[in-house]
Design a protein with these regions (language model features):
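Long, internal low-complexity/basic segments
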Residues: 26-28, 35, 271, 277-294, ...
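A short aromatic-rich beta-strand->coil structural motif
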Residues: 30, 36, 113, 125, ...
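C-terminal cap/loop subdomain of S1 sulfatases and analogous C-terminal strand-loop tails that border
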Residues: 143-152, 333-339, 380-383, 387-473, ...
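Short, solvent-exposed turn/loop segments enriched in Gly/Ser/Thr/Pro and often Arg
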Residues: 45-46, 58-81, 88, 122-134, ...
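Active-site-proximal cap/lid insertion segments
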Residues: 40-41, 150-181, 195-204, 209-376, ...
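Loop/turn elements at helix/coil->beta-strand transitions in domains of secreted/extracellular proteins
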Residues: 26-31, 55-60, 71, 84, ...
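Active-site segment of extracytoplasmic enzymes that catalyze sulfate/phosphate-ester chemistry
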Residues: 32-33, 39-121, 132, 150, ...
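Secretory targeting and sorting signals
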Residues: 1-22
Length: 521
């Protein structure tokens, strides 16, 4: 395994590459890998992704605005918090999904990037309930559009759109799966995008976003189903299930899966007596623990293919392209598997759900230092960051709730950086008319779901206010990094309540801007 990883990393840095195009862009290319439900505890099993830290910047305190798919992705696309996008859940009947997001499609980072001369491509998961049917509408700003038209969570029985501006004309093709694992298919389409960009737009930079569904669970799990809830590629499944198969990862990326145990996760099955009533529950039973153990191992197996995909896409770059490309890796939200006795899901304000990986590999401009920053960053910052990387004017890039992370990526000191992150969440309505919410499985299984809440996270504190509950939740995260000892009567809560009031209204008429509101009193 170590030899294989070394070979991949060497390939990304110094291996011979395909011939470069006649004209190499002066502005950098940008490749953005956005994965689905990837919690920070999976990163140690992703060698290629962790390799981005060499010559890159790791953000240790990167928080999503909501630990739920559509609100989080809407914040990413627009640079605005959910209370400003109006995208609060995953489904249209419930102030969410594509119905709530559609009005923002002309305001995503793709539009100014395309106007700035970038050739743009989007692959994989988009926004829930996007109507990918015959004659589908390609959103403004995208030159290539390869998104799920159904079945993406299954990973094998899916359909993908296949729109290429220079080749498709008025046609809006949809291609069914041929049985290939979806992550592998996205890798192939991503390499095709890079190759077509050389052909169709020589001398122009490109922006490529690759958004696999992995490691999200399947949404069609039924009693007695033998297919895993979290479906890895066949090559990464246990050897005894495929005795004649090829297993380059040892199933779990090198470590023996049998030695990986979900019960070792911080705050697993923690006593929740001091927590709000929606969290309090009995200890996790042995049968459920065994299910979670297998879920954790399958999630690790799933991200082996994501790791492969990242390596495969980056190995497609020519040497000049590699030296002139930002590579960004992040997740839309985290996930829990037994922490705080929360069985399976997300949506909470605890770190395992909202504090997710963000790694940015820089173009080669000199020293390849490995940088680490503890500055508080959020997904609302990605809009401004991508535009800053592309050289778009500050008047456009800084017009939303976030700010560019590029100075931090480059190791520059930034005065007066934000001191507080906002996390806000609206509890989804459990009714499921039409297509089911892909996260409704957690409701059907009786898993605890938080009430509607707003929270503020600083460098050393977490403060949460729940709807219809006069008592807040408070943690000193320096002394209690696992958020195990709730202290709602702490004297700091009054000050943090004021910060939270400013953040939850920021950006509205008559309210402070969100950057000003993100500073402590």
């Amino acid at each position: 395994m170590a030899a294989a990883v070394a070979a991949i990393l060497a390939l990304l840095i110094a291996s011979p590459a395909p011939p470069a195009s006649a004209a190499t862009p002066t502005r950098p290319n940008i490749i953005f890998f956005l994965v689905d439900d990837l919690s920070a505890d999976l990163l140690p099993y992703m060698d290629t992704v962790r390799g981005l830290a060499e010559g890159g910047t790791t953000f240790t305190d990167y928080y999503v605005s909501d630990s739920l798919c559509c609100p989080s992705r809407a914040s990413m696309f627009t640079g605005q918090f959910p209370h400003n996008t109006g995208v609060r859940t995953n489904q249209g009947y419930d102030r969410g999904g594509y119905e709530a997001f559609a009005r923002h499609e002309g305001r995503t980072y793709a539009v100014p990037l395309h106007q700035a001369g970038y050739r743009t491509g989007y692959l994989g998961k988009y926004i829930n309930e996007y109507p990918a049917r015959p004659g589908y509408q390609v959103p403004d700003g995208w030159d290539e559009w390869h998104v799920s038209a159904g079945g993406g969570y299954n990973e094998f029985r899916y359909q993908l759109t296949r729109y290429i501006r220079e080749e498709s004309g008025d046609r809006r093709p949809i291609a069914p799966s041929k049985g290939d694992y979806l992550v592998d298919e996205l890798a192939q389409r991503a390499t095709g995008f890079i190759e077509r960009s050389r052909e169709h737009a020589p001398g122009r930079p490109f922006f490529l976003q690759v958004s696999p569904f992995s490691p999200h669970n399947r949404v069609d799990v039924r009693p007695g189903d033998t297919e895993p809830r979290f479906p890895p590629a066949p090559r990464d499944r246990p050897k005894d299930r495929f005795p004649d198969g090829e297993f380059p990862h040892g199933d779990c990326g090198g470590p023996d899966c049998a030695g990986i145990d979900v019960t070792t996760l911080p705050s697993y099955d923690e006593d929740t007596a001091d927590k709000p009533s929606w969290v309090r529950r009995a200890p996790i039973e042995a049968k459920r623990a065994e299910e979670l153990r297998e879920d954790f191992r399958d999630r690790i197996r799933m991200v082996q293919s994501v790791d492969d995909m990242v390596g495969r896409v980056l190995s497609t770059l020519t040497e000049p392209e590699r030296r002139n490309t930002y590579v960004v890796f992040a997740s839309d939200n985290g996930f829990h598997l037994g922490q705080h006795r929360l069985v399976r899901g997300k949506s909470t304000a605890y770190d395992h759900d909202v504090r997710v990986p963000l790694l940015v590999r820089r173009p080669v401009t000199g020293e390849r230092d490995r940088l680490v920053t503890g500055a508080i960053a959020q997904n609302v910052d990605l809009f401004a960051t991508f535009l800053d990387m592309a050289g778009v004017a500050p008047a456009i890039r800084d017009s939303r709730d976030g700010r560019s992370l590029l100075p931090l990526v480059q190791g520059r000191q930034v005065a007066d950086w934000r001191q507080a992150a906002l996390v806000e969440h609206v509890k989804p309505d459990p009714r499921t008319p039409g297509r089911p919410d892909p996260d409704a499985d957690r409701l059907r299984q009786g898993n605890a779901q938080p009430p509607t809440y707003n929270a503020v996270r600083t460098a050393g504190e977490l403060y949460v206010e729940y709807e219809n509950d006069p008592k807040p939740e408070y943690y000193n995260t320096v002394a209690d990094p696992r958020q195990e000892s709730n202290d709602p009567g702490n004297a700091r809560t009054a000050s943090l309540a004021g910060v939270l009031r400013g953040l939850t209204t920021c950006g509205k008429p008559g309210a402070p801007d969100c950057w000003t509101a993100a500073h402590l009193h």
